[in-house]
Amino acid sequence: MKIEKCGWSEGLTSIKGNCHNFYTAISKDVTYKELKNLLNSKNIMLIDVREIWEILEYQKIPESINVPLDEVGEALQMNPRDFKEKYNEVKPSKSDS
């Protein structure tokens, strides 16, 4: 597996595998208040990777997009129309990072 710095976003690393390219950001813990402020500012796109049963049991995070973790790689490869149809949200673009 090859790990390299991505050219399109600071702080992201590309891990090139056989089928998909995955991108990870540097992990940063945020408080509830910080997250609430970020969501209110509209300067963040929060992808909630919990499973559907977790959303049903614990509720959806307001202003988040739910894409279960095992679907993230495939979801980010979808065309925008298919993403909108499946997740009922606008697909994030590389420039949103």
UniProtKB/Swiss-Prot annotation:
Organism phylogeny: Eukaryota, Metazoa, Chordata, Craniata, Vertebrata
Domain Rhodanese: 32-84
N6-succinyllysine sites (modified residues): K84
Alphabetized InterPro entries for the sequence: Rhodanese-like_dom, Rhodanese-like_dom_sf
Protein name: Thiosulfate sulfurtransferase/rhodanese-like domain-containing protein 3
Domain of life: Eukaryota
Pfam families linked to this entry: Rhodanese (PF00581)
